[in-house]
Amino acid sequence: FQLQGNQGAACLFAGSPTDGLMGGGFLYTNENTLSLGLVCGLHHLHDAKKSVPQMLEDFKQHPAVAPLIAGGKLVEYSAHVVPEAGINMLPELVGDGVLIAGDA
């Protein structure tokens, strides 16, 4: 990636990683690893012709991605559901003697 010092790189992909569904893919550099993943709206997954794990495997074989991860090994696998409604969907996060913070 030709990075120096504390630099990092973020590569974003649209369309192809999620087989044409709303969403895309990402590749982020970390100090000694890469993070590779997909983003897809849950409400679109019922229209998917492939499972999410198959979409990820296909993404890993994409000509723009495969050379970047060649020789790498999987060290962690995770999935997250991320709300899309924005700040207006959040409940009150503070009250008498309580504060909710983080990924609660």
Enumerate the predicted regions with their spans.
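Central beta-strand plus flanking loop segment that forms part of the substrate or channel wall
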Residues: 1-10, 64
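Residue-level signal for well-ordered alpha-helical segments
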Residues: 4, 11-13, 36, 75-77, ...
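FAD/FMN-dependent oxidoreductases across multiple families
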Residues: 19, 46-104
